[in-house]
């Protein structure tokens, strides 16, 4: 049975594969679309196995928020050329839409969820591997929830943030917070949420610097505590200077909207080196 251009177009729409890959799969399967899809999928699996040790350092990072739930999804690949491909971005968007709709608990659950055609996200990623010949992986799935939420995607689709709040917040103020997180990369909302190993590391560094500077040993702990407080001001969100107005901390800026307004959590993911 001859393969028609209509058959090729139909399989291409189903699989996202290239025209020649679709033509070859249809010829090999004698125009059986189910078998042709399996041929394309197996090609993707073979490519994935060959390229499993490659680094997927490029990709597309997107985020969204709705009704107090916000999520980030990152689909990674090897080259910027593929990352900017419309079908790659569309797949990332479809994965994000599914995450927003189903709210899975982790990456594994997200990969197992179906897209509109009934095939899993994992299968769709494998199919794209076969099309592009590049390693691809779901690099991140992060989410946060609260009484209200916000998302931000930095131009270029390499960095995204989400944040959640304890009460309703004006949109521009929420967006300012999401952009602050993107720009200043805080490690936590509050000092008490900073990991203990980071605290210990900062104290040790401060003590060593003071000792090298010839400070008396009986003052080292006090100097180290002062350095730690400076670290908190620079690296915990509520204590950071607001990038749009350095006279205000983020906490003070939030209180211009409501005296009880605060950030309950945030997530940030980037493909760039900070």
From Swiss-Prot:
The keyword Cytoplasm applies. InterPro entries: EF-Ts_dimer_sf (IPR036402), Transl_elong_EFTs/EF1B (IPR001816), Transl_elong_EFTs/EF1B_dimer (IPR014039), Transl_elong_Ts_CS (IPR018101), UBA-like_sf (IPR009060). It is found in: Cytoplasm. The keyword Protein biosynthesis applies. It comes from the Bacteria. Keywords: Cytoplasm, Elongation factor, Protein biosynthesis. Its main location: cytoplasm. Pfam families: EF_TS (PF00889). SUPFAM superfamilies: Elongation factor Ts (EF-Ts), dimerisation domain, UBA-like. PROSITE patterns: EF_TS_1, EF_TS_2. Disulfide bonds: none annotated. GO terms for molecular function: translation elongation factor activity. Residues 79-82 are annotated as: Involved in Mg(2+) ion dislocation from EF-Tu. CDD domains: UBA_EF-Ts. Belongs to the EF-Ts family. Associates with the EF-Tu.GDP complex and induces the exchange of GDP to GTP. It remains bound to the aminoacyl-tRNA.EF-Tu.GTP complex up to the GTP hydrolysis stage on the ribosome. This is Elongation factor Ts. It comes from Porphyromonas gingivalis (strain ATCC BAA-308 / W83).
């Amino acid at each position: 049975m001859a393969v028609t251009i209509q058959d090729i177009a139909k399989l291409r729409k189903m699989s996202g594969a290239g025209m020649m890959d679709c033509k070859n799969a249809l010829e090999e399967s004698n125009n059986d679309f189910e078998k042709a899809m399996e041929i394309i999928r197996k090609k993707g699996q073979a490519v994935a196995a060959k390229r499993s040790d490659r680094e997927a350092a490029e990709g597309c990072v997107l985020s969204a928020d709705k009704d107090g739930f916000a999520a980030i999804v990152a689909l990674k690949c090897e080259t910027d050329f593929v990352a900017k491909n419309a079908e790659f971005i569309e797949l990332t968007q479809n994965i994000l839409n599914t995450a927003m709709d189903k709210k899975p608990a982790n990456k594994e659950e997200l990969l197992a969820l179906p897209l509109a055609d009934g095939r899993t996200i994992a299968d769709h990623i494998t199919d794209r591997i076969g099309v592009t010949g590049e390693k691809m992986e779901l690099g991140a799935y992060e989410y946060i929830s609260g009484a209200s939420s916000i998302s931000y995607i930095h131009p270029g689709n390499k960095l995204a943030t989400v944040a959640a709040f304890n009460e309703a917040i004006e949109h521009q103020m929420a967006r300012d917070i999401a952009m602050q997180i993107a720009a200043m990369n805080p490690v936590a909302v509050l000092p008490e949420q900073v990991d203990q190993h980071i605290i210990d590391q900062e104290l040790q560094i401060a003590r060593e610097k003071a000792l090298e500077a010839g400070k008396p040993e009986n003052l080292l702990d006090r100097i180290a505590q002062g350095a730690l407080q400076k670290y908190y001001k620079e690296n915990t969100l509520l204590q950071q200077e607001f990038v749009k107005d350095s006279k205000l901390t983020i906490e003070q800026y939030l209180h211009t909207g409501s005296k009880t307004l605060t950030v309950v959590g945030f997530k940030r993911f980037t493909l760039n080196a900070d």
